[in-house]
Amino acid sequence: GSTAVGNEILKCAANNLIPSTVELGGKSPNIYFEDVLDYEDDYLNKCAEGLLLGFFNQGEVCTCPSRALIQESIYDRFLDIVVERSKTIKQGNPLDPETQVGAQASKEQFDKIMSYMEIGRQEGAQILIGGDSANLSGDLSGGYYVQPTLMAGKNDMRIFQEEIFGPTLGVTSFKDEAEALAIANDTDYGL
């Protein structure tokens, strides 16, 4: 759950002297250095796939990457690969084994994700793919489907700092290892 919910749970538990541990959210970064392009084979494909795992299970998994930090020297080329790969993601009925991204868990979560996309736009994020609800046909029409979304921006934007818990990823660039580590650790979560 969110940090705010975890805080409330721990307060209630403490008031009743109940020992408790909670597993909360985060803004885990995947960091891509320029040498990933030295291996234009299965390794590079796995790097792109690792980033796209942020979309699977609708992005509603605590271990999903939610920020991508890409070295400046490969930023455009690596993102081109990721964007092309993202076009093959199948959205649909979560009971279909071919589906990679289904509907969000609730209308509340759907609305939260959509509001963060608007916040990202207002703060100047560039939508690279997605950025809207997904309109599926038939029985799935009107469901809480969100397009897998990549938003390019800066680490001080809310889409980089606050947990969205949906199929959205913030991407930014860095110059060197020191800057990558500074960006990676520049959240309240410290992940």
Regions found by a protein language model. Name each.
Residues 1-155, 178, 182-183:
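ALDH superfamily catalytic-core signature
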Residues 106, 170-175:
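A structural signal for short, well-ordered beta-strand elements
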Residues 157-161:
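Cytochrome P450 core scaffold surrounding the K-helix E-X-X-R motif
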Residues 167:
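Glycine-rich nucleotide-phosphate-binding loops and adjacent flexible coil segments
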Residues 188-191:
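Short, intrinsically disordered, charge-balanced linker/junction segments flanking boundaries
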